[in-house]
């Protein structure tokens, strides 16, 4: 049986832009994507700490420090809001025993402040 687990988390990212006219998605700093293993067009869940909104969307790579809510998701937050971005995976019970997610705590400029090892 496969189970759903947290694979990666960007904790307390700061929204730097909201573009209602874009087709959709969330733009995330390419360096952060590399560090977490999140791929372009991968589905992610996003939780807005400021207003409690939660939504699912897909990722597109962006510039250094960039976190942009695009299209309809631009209605889910404003510049300056803090968000948590989650990526999940399905793994077997055997794989789960030694599995560790990648968790990055970010500062207000979306730089890695700390990598949490669980």
Q: What does each model-found stretch correspond to?
A:
Residues 102-118:
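Short, glycine/charged-enriched hinge/interface segments at domain edges or termini
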Residues 2-4, 11:
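A cross-kingdom feature strongest in bacterial/archaeal respiratory oxidoreductases
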Residues 5, 15-16, 20-97, 108-111:
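Compact, glycine-rich, soluble single-domain proteins
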């Amino acid at each position: 049986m496969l189970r759903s687990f947290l694979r990666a988390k960007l904790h307390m990212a700061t929204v730097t832009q909201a573009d209602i006219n874009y087709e959709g998605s969330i733009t995330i700093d390419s360096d952060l994507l590399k560090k977490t293993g999140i791929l372009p067009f991968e589905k992610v869940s996003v939780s807005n700490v400021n207003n409690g909104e939660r939504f699912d969307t897909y990722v597109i790579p962006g510039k250094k420090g960039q976190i942009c809510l695009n299209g309809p998701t631009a209605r889910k937050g404003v510049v300056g809001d803090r968000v948590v971005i989650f990526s999940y995976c399905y793994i077997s019970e055997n794989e789960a025993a030694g599995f560790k997610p990648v968790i990055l705590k970010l500062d207000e400029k979306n730089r890695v402040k700390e990598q949490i090892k669980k």
